[in-house]
A protein has these predicted regions:
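Short, solvent-exposed alpha-helical "recognition" segments
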Residues: 32-39
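A short, Lys/Arg-enriched interface patch at domain edges and termini
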Residues: 53-84
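Short Lys/Arg-enriched helix C-cap and helix-to-coil transition segments
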Residues: 39-46
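Polyanion-binding surface elements
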Residues: 1-29, 56-63
């Protein structure tokens, strides 16, 4: 049996609804390394976020993980993108 990762891409309105953040706060958190950046879906302006990455960060926040560890988690998630 092979392990297959089911990847779901969410667009900005879905991710904003998942996080409960306003757009400006959302982009600030990406710049600060507290949320993963989007991936390109074709054209330069078409982007989306990998759902399991957002869910992992939200779970870490709910668990009370310190910000420095959340930044490390986000970096690990970004680094794992090359393994798909």
């Amino acid at each position: 049996m092979t392990n297959t990762v089911q990847i779901k891409i969410n667009r900005k309105p879905e991710v904003l609804a998942m996080t409960g953040l306003k757009k400006s706060t959302f982009y600030t958190r990406i710049k600060e390394g507290l949320l993963p950046p989007p991936i390109q879906l074709g054209s330069e302006r078409t982007v989306g976020w990998i759902e399991h990455e957002i869910q992992a960060v939200l779970a870490a926040m709910c668990a009370g993980m310190p910000l420095i560890q959340i930044k490390e988690l986000v970096q690990d998630l970004i680094n794992q993108r090359t393994k798909f």
